[in-house]
């Protein structure tokens, strides 16, 4: 079944870089990233990174593909030049109509308000210390596995409901 094939696109960004670490790479071939591949260095052009990534991904997937977009950031948007919140909200809403699922994970901000401003219902907060960051990734991984387990048995519009709920970590 085509829904059993999983691909990863991973983008690291800051105010000076937009780095596609993985672009539609088979999930089984994606390996842990290194510190050299991901070195945050200030500035969070979150809207620009989201707008560019969603637009690029939209051009590469089929309308019947299940797409899960997870945004992880340690700070508020503060450096975008091409997209604003309204444009991202419209883009997210358009893609949700095509059964894309969005999750937002953030630190050092009002995560619920930021996610809501972009029309993202599934959100998770973490603290930027080693223990909480590791716990956030454990929880996200557990939720992702639960999501993958539902892909073939749950209608696409229901996949986005309660992404971070009911998971034992």
Question: Predicted segment positions?
Answer:
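Acidic, low-complexity intrinsically disordered regions
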Residues: 2-169
